[in-house]
Amino acid sequence: MSDVKKVVLAYSGGLDTSVILKWLEETYGCEVVTFTADLGQGEELEPARRKAEAFGIREIYVDDLREEFARDFVFPMFRANAVYEGEYLLGTSIARPLIAKRQVEIARETGADAVAHGATGKGNDQVRFELGYYGLEPGIKVIAPWREWDLNSRERLLQYAERHGIDIEGKREEGGAPYSMDANLLHISYEGGVLEDTWTEAEEAMWLWTNAPEAAPDEPQYIDIAFAGGDPVAIDGERLSPAALLGRLNDLGARHGIGRIDIVENRYVGMKSRGCYETPGGTILLRAHRAMESITLDRDAAHLKDELMPRYAELVYNGYWFAPEREALQAMIDQTQQDVEGTVRLKLYKGNVIVVGRQSPKSLFDASVATFEDDAGAYDQKDAEGFIRLNALRLRLGAKRRG
């Protein structure tokens, strides 16, 4: 790819991507456009702009994508109740397609012929980014420095930075933090370092977002979440934008010690990896959404969704957000959400999210039918006999054959 003229780099301003920026200029002799995404990671992003300016970069993009992230990526995923391997709420996985999408858009806007990312050759993110690139712009050139260069240790990166006068001050990870961290509006992840020993408990100081459950308030807090079309639209009667609503749930969940997990997951590239995650708002939202569905979804539609959910979650985890099979599943899921409307009441207490009430104008729950009291003929219990005998037929035939 020696003919690369201009490349759009996903740029954080940290050590890795700053070295990549200089390396791209040196190796390819190309112009670099930097792109820094605000996905709600809580960092001041202007330092990334200033650092890019110090490199002499002429085209610098620092984009606030929080609303698009929540509205067009997080919320559609939560309509599916997507959970990977029973625990992971896909906070990193769902962010990569949006970054890839915006990189491709910037490449088109600036006339760039290539994109670049800072994901390593061992992880899932390289796959997620590049499947996104190719799914949106099949002819794009992709540069993945970690698969090309020999700067395969932090010491070599630091030496390269020193030789080229790259400022590496002020970043926590550059000071030798014991974890690799990634944050956005949905979660914070922690990997590597001491966590590579699967028997070692993560230190309390690692968790940057949530209170420990035992340190959470001793009094529970009740909240109401309103839904329309399968998406949350209000908390305690206050309508909020998608990003603001998720941010509010994060604050509530963090205060009450909600959303910590410590898991070993199966990466798409084949290895197992330990990760610790904080997903306070997402944990609340998942519980609330399932409660809302419990009274508004038809039984078999709900069961079909649950059967398909692991496949949907796997597609998101592996990076197939823009693939036709994910889009087909999304269309089916979205059709089921038309009547997912109403309010769920939750009790938040020391790491727990407890559903205590749900109501909907589209509810399929009919107390006059479900009651244990006199139902005034709404349900004839004698009808159950024929239903049971028909469903028992194959079991009776099997028992007869066995003698």
From Swiss-Prot:
InterPro entries: Arginosuc_syn_C (IPR048268), Arginosuc_syn_N (IPR048267), Arginosuc_synth (IPR001518), Arginosuc_synth_CS (IPR018223), Arginosuc_synth_type_1_subfam (IPR023434), AS_cat/multimer_dom_body (IPR024074), Rossmann-like_a/b/a_fold (IPR014729). Its EC number is 6.3.4.5. It catalyses: L-citrulline + L-aspartate + ATP = 2-(N(omega)-L-arginino)succinate + AMP + diphosphate + H(+). L-citrulline binds at residues 88, 93, 124, 128, 180, 189, 265, 277. Keywords: Amino-acid biosynthesis, Arginine biosynthesis, ATP-binding, Cytoplasm, Ligase, Nucleotide-binding. It comes from the Bacteria. ATP binds at residues 10-18, 37, 118. GO terms for biological process: argininosuccinate metabolic process; L-arginine biosynthetic process; urea cycle. GO terms for molecular function: argininosuccinate synthase activity; ATP binding. Belongs to the argininosuccinate synthase family. Type 1 subfamily. This is Argininosuccinate synthase. It comes from Halorhodospira halophila (strain DSM 244 / SL1).
